[in-house]
């Protein structure tokens, strides 16, 4: 697809499509592939060119390709791990990214008030449900945890906040350290020094089996675990916003980059500023437990780096609430 044609397409309203509908197929042919329409006929050369522009990974199988270049979903396939993967129209991704970052800004705007509400909720009985779920939300805020999924814990041995076990927490003086293998086999080490949270964590680990679920509430002699849906529901209730723990990760990655760039002496050369931006992204990636490439493409609001390039940063801040307010102000000027 030519650049001009692509530019024209972005002005055309996208169509919502389903991979359950008629589509094109990719089939093995020697060392490459053949592309067939819904009737099994070979695609025209210009159609093949459009499919190749989608850069569908060669390892994908059972590939469905949208016949309409305006479809919001352009291709679907199954990767080597058996997971369904999706290729979306770039304009659809752009709009989704804008919505994601705008949603994160609104989260950041409301976070200071939410932390005040959480402080009250964290004063309850440390093994009662209200308190434990509040502790989970605060841990997401402080530690940038993924919530995790039962299937990943059982099948891959990878954990998130709601699937962590008692054995994943170690005491180190006045700190509690979470050490575990997360999504993608990445080793995580998250240090918590908040005194109120530590009191709750200690109550949840005391006299319990090492393989017991950390985030659980005591009902008589039984411990009942907290799941990701319950934590996300509390997040939405507190923020009065349709967000999840993942939006916290987007916001925390963005504020981490903004703070790093505010604390460096801005380089005078373009290459120097690019290096400083890379270093800020690396810091966010470490917090997230992702690669710098993923952190930059999926989590950090690009406007923070663009503003830094133009000479705008948040200045120095002294508190987490101050950081949130400063980044919101920077991004909404």
What is the predicted role of each segment?
Residues 1-159, 165-277, 281-288, 293-297, ...:
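A positively charged, amphipathic N-terminal helix/segment that binds anionic biomolecules
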Residues 302-328:
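DNA/chromatin major-groove-contacting recognition/catalytic segments
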């Amino acid at each position: 697809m030519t650049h001009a044609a692509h530019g024209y397409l972005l002005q055309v309203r996208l169509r919502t499509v389903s991979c359950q509908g008629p589509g094109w197929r990719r089939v093995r042919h020697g060392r490459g592939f053949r592309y067939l329409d819904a009737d099994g006929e070979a695609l025209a050369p210009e159609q093949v060119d459009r499919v190749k522009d989608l850069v569908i990974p060669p390892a994908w199988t059972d590939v469905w390709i949208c016949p309409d270049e305006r479809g919001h979903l352009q291709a679907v396939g199954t990767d080597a791990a058996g997971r369904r993967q999706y290729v979306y129209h770039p304009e659809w991704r752009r709009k989704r990214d804008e919505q994601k970052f705008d949603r994160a800004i609104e989260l950041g705007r409301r976070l200071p008030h939410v932390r005040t509400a959480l402080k009250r909720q964290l004063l309850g009985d440390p093994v009662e449900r209200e308190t434990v779920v509040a502790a989970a939300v605060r841990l997401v805020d402080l530690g940038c945890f993924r919530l995790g999924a039962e299937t990943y814990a059982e099948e891959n041995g990878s954990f998130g906040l709601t699937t962590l076990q008692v054995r994943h927490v170690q005491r180190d003086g006045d700190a509690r350290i979470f050490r575990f293998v997360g999504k993608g086999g990445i080793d995580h080490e998250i240090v918590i020094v908040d005194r109120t949270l530590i009191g709750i964590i200690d109550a949840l680990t005391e006299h319990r089996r090492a393989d017991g679920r950390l985030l659980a509430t005591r009902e008589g002699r039984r411990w009942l675990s907290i799941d990701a849906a319950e934590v996300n529901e509390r997040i939405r209730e507190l923020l009065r916003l349709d967000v999840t723990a993942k939006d916290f990760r987007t916001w925390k990655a963005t504020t981490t980059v903004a703070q790093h760039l505010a604390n460096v002496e801005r380089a005078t050369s373009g290459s120097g500023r690019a290096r400083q931006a890379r270093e800020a992204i690396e810091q966010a990636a470490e917090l997230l437990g992702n690669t710098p490439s993923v952190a930059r493409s999926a989590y950090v609001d690009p406007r923070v780096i663009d503003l830094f390039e133009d000479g705008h940063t948040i200045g120095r801040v002294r508190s987490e609430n101050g950081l949130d307010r400063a980044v919101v102000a920077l991004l909404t000027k």
